[in-house]
Amino acid sequence: MKVVSSIGALKYRHPDCQVVKRRGRIYVICKSNPKFKVRQGGAKSKKARR
Protein backbone atom coordinates (compact mmCIF):
# COMPACT_ATOMS: atom_id res chain seq x y z
CA MET A 1 0.00 0.00 0.00
CA LYS A 2 1.33 3.43 -0.91
CA VAL A 3 1.03 6.26 1.59
CA VAL A 4 1.15 9.90 0.53
CA SER A 5 1.84 12.72 2.97
CA SER A 6 0.12 15.40 0.90
CA ILE A 7 -3.39 14.95 -0.49
CA GLY A 8 -3.01 18.10 -2.59
CA ALA A 9 -0.26 16.46 -4.64
CA LEU A 10 -2.67 13.69 -5.70
CA LYS A 11 -4.68 16.01 -7.91
CA TYR A 12 -1.91 15.63 -10.50
CA ARG A 13 -2.37 11.84 -10.81
CA HIS A 14 -4.94 12.21 -13.57
CA PRO A 15 -6.25 15.23 -15.52
CA ASP A 16 -9.81 14.66 -14.21
CA CYS A 17 -8.86 14.53 -10.50
CA GLN A 18 -10.13 17.39 -8.35
CA VAL A 19 -9.77 18.31 -4.67
CA VAL A 20 -13.02 18.93 -2.76
CA LYS A 21 -13.65 19.96 0.87
CA ARG A 22 -16.81 18.51 2.44
CA ARG A 23 -17.80 18.45 6.13
CA GLY A 24 -14.27 19.23 7.30
CA ARG A 25 -12.68 16.47 5.25
CA ILE A 26 -10.58 16.73 2.10
CA TYR A 27 -11.41 14.43 -0.80
CA VAL A 28 -9.76 13.81 -4.15
CA ILE A 29 -12.41 12.62 -6.60
CA CYS A 30 -11.92 11.35 -10.12
CA LYS A 31 -15.04 10.49 -12.10
CA SER A 32 -13.28 8.92 -15.08
CA ASN A 33 -10.99 6.68 -12.98
CA PRO A 34 -12.46 5.96 -9.51
CA LYS A 35 -9.36 4.14 -8.23
CA PHE A 36 -7.82 7.55 -7.51
CA LYS A 37 -10.39 8.41 -4.81
CA VAL A 38 -8.78 9.58 -1.54
CA ARG A 39 -10.00 11.02 1.77
CA GLN A 40 -8.09 12.85 4.48
CA GLY A 41 -9.16 14.08 7.92
CA GLY A 42 -11.41 11.36 9.33
CA ALA A 43 -10.91 11.07 13.09
CA LYS A 44 -12.08 13.72 15.52
CA SER A 45 -11.53 13.84 19.27
CA LYS A 46 -14.44 12.59 21.34
CA LYS A 47 -15.91 14.60 24.20
CA ALA A 48 -15.40 13.27 27.72
CA ARG A 49 -18.62 12.01 29.29
CA ARG A 50 -19.43 12.82 32.88
Curated annotation (Swiss-Prot):
One of its GO terms (molecular function) is structural constituent of ribosome. One of its GO terms (biological process) is translation. It comes from the Bacteria. Pfam families: Ribosomal_L36. Keywords: Ribonucleoprotein, Ribosomal protein. GO terms for cellular component: ribonucleoprotein complex; ribosome. InterPro entries: Ribosomal_bL36, Ribosomal_bL36_sp, Ribosomal_L36_bact. PROSITE patterns: RIBOSOMAL_L36. The keyword Disulfide bond does not apply. Belongs to the bacterial ribosomal protein bL36 family. NCBIfam families: PRK00831.1 (NF002021), rpmJ_bact (TIGR01022). This is Large ribosomal subunit protein bL36. It comes from Rhodopirellula baltica (strain DSM 10527 / NCIMB 13988 / SH1).
